[in-house]
Amino acid sequence: MRRIAIVHDWLTGMRGGERCLEVFCELFPEADLFTLLHRRKTISEVIERMRIRTSFIQHLPLAACFYRYYLPLFPLAVERFDFRGYDLILSSSHCVAKGAVRAPGTLHISYTYTPMRYAWDLYGAYFGDWTGPIASCIIPTLMGRLQRWDLRDRKSVV
């Protein structure tokens, strides 16, 4: 039997990406579902029935409510998932799930909804308008790193 891993950015509500994820879960109910963060009872029963594996982000202080502020850690979190022994990785991504690192011989198919827009042009829309000398130094540096990662991580997908 083929082992399948589904990777989704986070599970905190039912929006468009989660509706697609729900279909993937119906197609592959035996798959393991990897995600950065899972807030129970915020997603459909179809998704809740999956074997859900979360990242270290799940255990960070206040992550359930303020997970977006951990954005600079998201690439590290998704890259730390261990996919050895899986034949297929199916990532459902609008952020970092597409950056799942495949093991040799593993096929990675990514359904990418959009680029990581908050790293490119919509940071203020997602996080508010941070101003001040510290934010004006740190934010562009962090966003530059995320942009480079966003471009580089495409190489994991075959």
Model-derived features with residue positions:
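Nucleotide-activated donor-dependent transferases that construct or modify glycoconjugates
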Residues: M1-T12, L36-L37
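Hydrophobic anchor at the start of a short beta-strand
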Residues: I4, E30-A31, H108
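Short catalytic/ligand-binding loop motif for oxyanion handling, primarily in non-cytosolic enzymes
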Residues: G13, K41-I43, A97-V101, R117-W120
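Short amphipathic alpha-helix
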Residues: G17-L27
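Active-site donor-binding segments of glycosyltransferases and PAPS-dependent sulfotransferases
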Residues: L27-K98
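Short, well-ordered alpha-helix to beta-strand connector turns
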Residues: F28, G85-D87, G105-T106, R154-V158
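Active-site proximal beta-strand in glycosyltransferases
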Residues: L88-S91, R102-G132
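Membrane-proximal helix-turn-helix segments that form the acceptor-binding/catalytic region
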Residues: G128, G132-V158
